């Protein structure tokens, strides 16, 4: 079986996705923002399951694709309702990153955000 598809531009995706936004809440940002937060949480939950179950979690790739699709849909709705173009947001990638400093490649831990005297009292 061959899946046939036509690649979409960011703007084409946004235009098609917005035709499925059926909420009649006057264009409020509340619903799509809550949806974006919820779907991002669902994506993080899939990552958690993969870390916990490792190789035994066979549905990971499909679940991540599904959740990322939902995140993208809600991001599109938030952008549109906020008067922004998804193309403009995606175009932000072309800006320079000279203002970003490279962080050291160290493991993230709860202790890394605490002053040493606080961490030593928790040991």
Please describe what each predicted stretch is.
Residues 1-123:
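Flexible "arm" and connector segments at domain edges
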């Amino acid at each position: 079986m061959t899946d046939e598809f036509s690649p979409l531009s960011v703007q084409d995706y946004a235009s098609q996705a917005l035709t499925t936004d059926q909420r009649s809440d006057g264009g409020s940002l509340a619903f799509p923002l809550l949806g974006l937060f919820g779907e991002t949480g669902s994506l993080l939950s899939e990552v958690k399951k993969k870390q916990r179950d490792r190789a035994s979690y066979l549905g990971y790739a499909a679940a991540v694709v599904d959740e990322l699709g939902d995140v993208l849909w809600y991001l599109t709705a938030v952008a549109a309702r906020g008067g922004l173009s998804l193309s403009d947001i995606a175009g932000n990638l072309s800006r320079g990153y000279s203002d970003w400093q490279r962080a050291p490649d160290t493991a993230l831990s709860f202790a890394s955000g605490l002053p040493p005297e606080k961490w030593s009292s928790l040991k």
